From Swiss-Prot:
InterPro entries: OXYTX_ICK. Residues 1-18 form the signal peptide. One of its GO terms (molecular function) is toxin activity. Residues 59-104 are annotated as: Linear cationic cytotoxin domain. Expressed by the venom gland. Has antimicrobial, insecticidal, cytolytic and cytotoxic activity. Belongs to the spiderine family. Cationic/spiderine subfamily. Keywords: Antibiotic, Antimicrobial, Cytolysis, Disulfide bond, Knottin, Secreted, Signal, Toxin. It comes from Oxyopes takobius (Lynx spider). The presence of a 'disulfide through disulfide knot' structurally defines this protein as a knottin. The N-terminal part of the mature protein (59-105) probably forms an alpha-helix which acts as a membrane-active peptide. It is necessary and sufficient for the toxin's antimicrobial, insecticidal, cytolytic and cytotoxic activity. This is Spiderine-2b. It is found in: Secreted.
């Protein structure tokens, strides 16, 4: 609202100054009306405008928060999280994620292509096609079926009790 009044006043002031050379062509009454409009804008108290804005701000109310309902939702989410933490598949995914994060952060035990024994092996997390690409103590793990090839590629992983490297030893 203030901005509109200031803009109107500025435009009116510009018109008065721009038409100053043309005073002779304009009638005195038109100039008088324009001058009165400028005076009216100048006399409008900004305090009344601020009071209106303050009144509107007072009328605005923040939504009430039901803290009990919020706490019960938080408790439900916590319980669901604990159930998920007990899930066998989630545990495996968490273990895989932790292993991957550790390998990315700490670096690898074996650099890609480094000979280990008679085999050349690739670092943990490196893409692989079969167990022979990985070190003897690692295996090539494919987390998804072949239709996701490229999206979730196979990679060398630490060998667990249920997974073994099936590549025949190098001669």
């Amino acid at each position: 609202m203030k901005f509109a009044l200031v803009l109107l006043g500025f435009c009116a002031f510009y018109l008065v100054n721009a038409t100053g050379d043309l005073e002779t062509e304009l009638e005195a009454s038109d100039l008088q009306e324009l001058q009165e409009a400028l005076d009216l804008i100048a006399e409008t108290p900004l305090e009344s405008l601020e009071a209106e804005e303050l009144e509107e701000a007072r009328k605005f109310k923040f939504p009430k928060i039901n803290w009990g309902k919020l706490a019960s939702k938080a408790k439900d989410v916590y319980k669901k999280g604990q159930k998920l933490a007990k899930n066998k598949n989630v545990k495996k995914a968490l273990k895989y994620g932790k292993q991957l994060a550790e390998n990315l952060a700490a670096g690898e035990v074996h650099e890609p292509g480094t000979p280990v024994g008679n085999n050349k092996c690739w670092a943990i997390g490196t893409r692989c096609t079969d167990d022979c690409d990985c070190c003897p103590e690692h295996h090539c793990h494919c987390p998804a079926k072949s239709w996701t090839f490229g999206l979730i590629p196979c990679s060398c992983q630490v060998t667990e009790s249920d997974k073994v490297n099936k590549c025949p030893p190098a001669e």
